[in-house]
From Swiss-Prot:
This is ATP synthase protein I. It comes from Synechococcus sp. (strain PCC 6716). A possible function for this protein is to guide the assembly of the membrane sector of the ATPase enzyme complex. The chain crosses the membrane at residues 10-30, 87-107. Its main location: membrane. The gene is atpI. Pfam families: CGL160_C (PF24763).
Amino acid sequence: MAEFYQLCRELFTTSLVLMAIAFGTVWVIYDLNTALNYLLGASASLIYLRLLARNVERLGHDQKKLGKTQLLVVVAVIILAARWHELHIIPVFLGFLTYKAAILVYMLRTVLPSP
């Protein structure tokens, strides 16, 4: 389980770093409103990642299969972006995909040989 907790910390930290870099970049290239839309989606991705890790941690101890509660985060954020006129769906959705970028960074670090 120590490896699992290390992986969770690493993915969460990488997601936070990527989120900060992308937020600053979007703010500079576009505007603050678009950057805040991105930040909303990225924050939802951190919540999603935490819920997913908690469900995986419980797997085998308390339950036999993964729950679907983490999917509620995605649905709620996309519905919020669609209903609220100040929010834009694309930056929110791309912000949500930040955790996937963190997984890609982790994969590249483990696959590619270190110097």
